[in-house]
Design a protein with these regions (language model features):
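Acidic, metal/ion-coordinating pockets
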Residues: 1-238
Length: 238
């Protein structure tokens, strides 16, 4: 089971704040938790950061209270995608702290590399009912904040749309897993149709070995399609 953004605007902070100054976000998931609990693998896109040493922010930058992860864990998520344009909203420290808080909740982050550099990191592979699923995630950009970090940190921690890197990673996933799932942050916000660039890249990914591509970023429902490759059907959701 896969869905789009967990995007915490400051209005959600206010509604979740308790009299003692702490937060409780469990109510946010009241109606979806029964569905998430049924999933063999539940993947969400956490669009923002959690950095306790940075001020809270709910637009244009996003940095949520640490308590959001308690609610996300209890809702039933197994994997959270961090490859998105807001992952640098509380700087590199926010990338590291967000991934660390997710891991401490027993959830697997994808789309950032906080242990080994991207070019040395092992693939994230989840075995579900005997099927090995490789999970990869990529973002079109980082809202220009990347210009304020070093090239070394950019290449080490982040997962961008460098085609040579993506091709190598997807081809490797095809060898190591039974199915390759891509979470992709790309497109134009609030546009109901994919761009030509989206279509071209998503089809390249199918050629490289991707089986399912879940697109994100537009914040509206764009079309989906099935693609025939080597006698199998591949799924693209733009």
């Amino acid at each position: 089971m896969v869905h789009g953004d967990l995007l915490y605007h400051d209005g959600l902070f206010f509604s979740a704040k308790k009299e003692d100054g702490t937060y409780d976000f469990h109510e946010n998931f009241e109606y979806v938790t029964p569905w998430l609990k049924q999933a063999d693998l539940a993947i969400g896109d956490f669009e923002g950061t959690i950095n306790k040493d940075h001020y809270l922010a709910g637009y244009l930058l996003f940095n949520a209270p640490v308590e959001v992860m308690d609610a996300i864990k209890e809702a039933g998520y197994h994997v959270l995608d961090l490859a998105h344009n807001h992952i640098l909203d509380s700087q590199i420290e926010g990338v590291i702290s967000t991934a660390d808080i997710i891991e401490k909740a027993g959830i697997t982050p994808i789309g950032v590399y906080t242990h080994e550099p991207r070019d040395q990191a092992p693939l994230v592979i989840k075995e579900v009912n005997g099927i090995k699923a490789a999970l990869l995630a990529y973002s079109y950009g980082f809202n220009g904040i990347e210009q304020y970090i070093s090239k070394e940190d950019y290449n080490r921690y982040l997962s961008d749309l460098n085609e040579d890197k993506m091709k190598a990673e997807i081809e490797r996933a095809e060898k190591e897993a039974d199915i390759t799932i891509i979470m992709l942050q790309m497109g134009v916000e609030y546009q109901l149709e994919p761009t030509e660039e989206q279509k071209a890249l998503y089809h390249k990914m199918i050629d490289w070995g991707a089986d399912i591509i879940f697109g994100g970023h537009p914040h509206v429902v764009e079309p989906s399609e099935t693609v025939e490759k080597d006698g199998d059907k591949k799924l693209i959701i733009y």
